[in-house]
């Protein structure tokens, strides 16, 4: 939109990013931080500064390529749906533009065991985009790679959890928005292309650690007492199977990452014990995608 403003948040970069921006794009507003606060706290600090100026904030990763007019359908959807807190575009892979991209595809969901999946992506299988998800849809979570959110809701729901540092923090925020009564949506009339893996490669043990630890923290925070313990017990069993697989393939670094994730979850979960516990289980009754994917061979969302 013509009234929009491009703001670059420099999260403690150590290259010549700031110099390049000042020289090549002097009209862009720059918000530099002296250190890398991570994906979560970097956005929190920026939005706390910018929220009074803007009704909507767009969280856009630096590895996302956009097309002219991509933002217009997202803003229009929020304007027309005041009960919706945040929206995402259709995310396609920047390296294989005929296919959906891992980190959001056409909108995210969470299965009964806490595993995130998407319209267009189950586990690591990304579907080709054949227009099968070209209608707007309510979703459980929207991708943080290109998230348009009401700044007031972002702040009232607590923003991204800085203890996550990176990975899955937008899913946690979306879960809290849903618990607060807000809707979330995927708006496929808007299309962007995401490179992905810009922070950490897929098989990096640090990524494995953050994904496993943060998923456990997210479940601990957002599930009611009535189902939290049983869900976490199932996850401990399933994560043990994943650990065994890494051991069997001699991938000891990723096996150690899972062990550290559970160790640190046990240490960190008490930080959330004083928060108000949810009373609604938003993933109860959702599909079991492990069963659907591995035993029944269902590799696509619509199957």
Regions found by a protein language model. Give the residues of each.
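A short, conserved alpha-helix in the catalytic core of glycosyltransferases
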Residues: 134-191
């Amino acid at each position: 939109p013509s009234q929009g403003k491009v703001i670059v948040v420099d999260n403690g970069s150590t290259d010549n990013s700031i110099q390049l921006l000042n020289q090549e794009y002097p009209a862009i507003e720059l918000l530099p931080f002296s250190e890398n606060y991570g994906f979560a706290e970097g956005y929190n600090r920026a939005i706390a500064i910018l929220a009074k100026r803007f009704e909507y904030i767009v969280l856009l990763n630096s590895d996302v390529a956009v097309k002219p007019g991509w933002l217009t359908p997202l803003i229009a959807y929020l304007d027309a749906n005041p009960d919706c807190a945040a929206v995402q575009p259709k995310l396609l892979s920047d390296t294989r533009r005929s296919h959906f991209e891992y980190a959001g595809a056409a909108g995210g969901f969470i299965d009964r065991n806490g595993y995130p999946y998407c319209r267009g992506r189950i586990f690591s299988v990304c579907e080709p985009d054949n227009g099968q998800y070209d209608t707007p849809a309510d979703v459980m979570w929207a991708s943080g790679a290109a998230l348009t959110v009401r700044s007031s809701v972002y702040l009232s729901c607590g923003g991204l959890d800085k203890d996550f540092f990176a990975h899955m923090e937008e899913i946690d925020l979306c879960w809290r928005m849903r618990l607060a009564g807000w809707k979330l949506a995927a708006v496929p009339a808007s299309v962007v292309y995401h490179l992905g893996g810009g922070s950490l490669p897929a098989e990096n043990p640090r990524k494995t650690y953050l994904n496993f630890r943060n998923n456990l923290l997210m479940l601990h925070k957002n599930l009611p007492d009535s189902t939290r313990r049983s869900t976490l017990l199932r996850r401990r069993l399933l994560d043990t199977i994943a650990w065994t697989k890494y051991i069997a393939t001699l991938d000891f670094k990723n096996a150690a990452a899972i062990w550290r994730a559970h160790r640190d979850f046990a240490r960190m979960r008490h930080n959330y014990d004083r928060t108000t516990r949810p009373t609604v289980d938003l993933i109860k009754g959702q599909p079991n995608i492990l069963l659907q994917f591995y035993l029944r061979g269902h590799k696509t969302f619509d199957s």
